Amino acid sequence: MSSSSSSLAAAAARKRALTEQRFSELSPALSPEVVKALKGGGFRRCTPVQAAAIPLLLSHKDVAVDAATGSGKTLAFVVPVVEILRRRPSPPKPHEVLGIIISPTRELSSQIYNVAQPFFATLKGVSSMLLVGGFDIKAELKKLEEEGANILVGTPGKLFDVMERLDTLNYKNLEILILDEADRLLDLGFQKQITSIISKLPKLRRTGLFSATQTEAVKELAKAGLRNPVRVEVKTEVKPTGKDGAQQELGPSKTPLGLRLEYMICEASNKSSQLVDFLVQNNGKKIMVYFATCACVDYWAIVLPLLDSLKGSPIIPYHGKMKQGPREKALASFSALSSGILVCTDVAARGLDIPHVDLIVQYDPPQDPNVFIHRAGRTARYDQEGDAIVFLLPKEDTYVEFLKRRGVPLTERECSTNAVDIVPQIRSAALEDRNVMEKGLTAFVSFVRAYKEHHCSYIFSWKDLEIGRLGMEYGLLQIPSMPEVKHHSLSLEGFTPVKDVDVTKIKYKDKAREKQRQKTLKRKAEELALRPEIEKRRKAPEKPEKPKRKKTGKQRQAVQTKEDMDELANEYRLLKKLKRGVIDEDEYEKLTGFGESDDDDSSDGGDSDLDERKERGNKVLKKIKQKGKAKGSRRFEGRSKQKTRRR
């Protein structure tokens, strides 16, 4: 992937990645113990971000650091934390928390904790604890309650939980708070937890906010959590190498020095074949391949090892839906390899410091364009060189110009003319194993739906997706029935379905799974056969209606009396309104029915009828009052009897 001229450029970049400033020459000076620990880890000279941030934090300043991924941010805050705690006049009490480091993911928190251990070990009488998800919270709370901790490293969710549940830890004398990958913390929705954590800490502290991108949300967080912060912005001047080996002046770049970025444009039906050819060309390297979804990772993690050209290559899946144990094991396994392939999602895009990664492949461009830089930054870290490539469809070519305008220049790489078509091999595997077929369908559907949610929808328009060619890329036997295909005129051009195949008869290679599937199919068939009988039972014959019994004379009289009383009560209410002047006599007549008559001459008797109605209303009033008095007297008598009984 690199020529002799590009190798020379990368070598020059490695030299520029470090400053001439040595850790031993920083001012304020570092302690001999920390300098020794740095030398033990192979760190003698500072990166630009370390040279800028460490002295500021040690000089009682708050800092907001904006630096490219892979620039050495971790040591830029671990060293100040250790030095600040070392300078305290007396050793801390067991439950006195003096330093907190917050990062967005379990993996990043664990990585920071492991990097910091040699430095924490130089502090006498100071204990530390890692607080991340996936572990028994009760056991952690018990340990904290019994032993305490002076430095806490963890994720915001877990730290918030601990602070809410446990009141034995003392934060009043906290010296320093670090927020690492601040933009990612906010993207993941931790704003509420971070605000709550900060509210429980003393204002007279030092705070470091470290981020690869300065978003508006990060700036707002800096205003809320930092006091007069010093802004540290570290950018690198990059001169990427073109096809002819000449260097192009492009000014400041957000990518690490020593990183070569390329892109390849190919049809969807040829994309998976180009990927495999590219992996074969770079056999023996340590490679990370990024996919859009967890389902895509699961699918390609089982398909790639089945291909003839990649048999024997270690291929490890890694995504956010894996359980904590397998995730940690996968990461540890890949980190220990000298060569191999990690197929992953964006959960591995930030913060992870995997050693000696040679090549980054972005098979699916990220939904968020900011993540592009973080993915590429897994290689070319510190003083190393590395390569990264992104695969694009023909209609996505404007993404190249978009990245260039954001300070991420790319050079084109032509499609290989020798790439072997892998679709027949994938389809053959799907016909032999139902697991491959099902995972392919799930991955295909998940990719289409993820594509719909792309932040750059004007470049990655899902309505322009060529579903037919995409189906060939995934080696599908048939295009699945899904709303995106059913209700929209997406192109099925380029797809050749496998004929004369009954997909319901494809079996699992795993005998136990197939046995369970057959049991399920048998049970469903039995349920289907019984359904008509069940439906028949449900539709029981309707019971004949009981003949209605005639009401007795008393019942009829009671109904009539109630109706009369209701009518009289209504008239009385209207009469009261008339007396108060709420309504006039015409309205009263209309509402009581006196204004309605078929004969014009009937109006002559209106006055006498009105007087009669008023008299009836007064009688109703008298009856209602009498009833009220009777009820009141009965209540009084009841209370008197109760008092008599008590006596």
From Swiss-Prot:
Its EC number is 3.6.4.13. Residues 619-633 have a biased composition (Basic residues). It comes from the Eukaryota. Pfam families: CTE_SPB4 (PF13959), DEAD (PF00270), Helicase_C (PF00271). Signal peptide: none annotated. Residues 507-582 form a coiled coil. A motif (Q motif) lies at residues 23-51. ATP binds at A67, A68, T69, G70, S71, G72, K73, T74. It catalyses: ATP + H2O = ADP + phosphate + H(+). InterPro entries: DEAD/DEAH_box_helicase_dom, DEAD_box_RNA_helicase, Helicase_ATP-bd, Helicase_C-like, P-loop_NTPase, RNA-helicase_DEAD-box_CS, RNA_helicase_DEAD_Q_motif, SPB4-like_CTE. Keywords: ATP-binding, Coiled coil, Helicase, Hydrolase, Nucleotide-binding, Phosphoprotein, RNA-binding. GO terms for molecular function: ATP binding; ATP hydrolysis activity; RNA binding; RNA helicase activity. Residues 512-565, 590-647 are annotated as: Disordered. A motif (DEAD box) lies at residues 180-183. GO terms for cellular component: nucleolus. Residues 596-610 have a biased composition (Acidic residues). Residues 512-545 have a biased composition (Basic and acidic residues). Phosphorylated. Residues 54-232 form the Helicase ATP-binding domain. PROSITE patterns: DEAD_ATP_HELICASE (PS00039), HELICASE_ATP_BIND_1 (PS51192), HELICASE_CTER (PS51194), Q_MOTIF (PS51195). Residues 274-430 form the Helicase C-terminal domain. The Q motif is unique to and characteristic of the DEAD box family of RNA helicases and controls ATP binding and hydrolysis. Interacts with BRI1. Belongs to the DEAD box helicase family. DDX55/SPB4 subfamily. This is DEAD-box ATP-dependent RNA helicase 18. The lineage of its organism: Eukaryota, Viridiplantae, Streptophyta, Embryophyta, Tracheophyta.
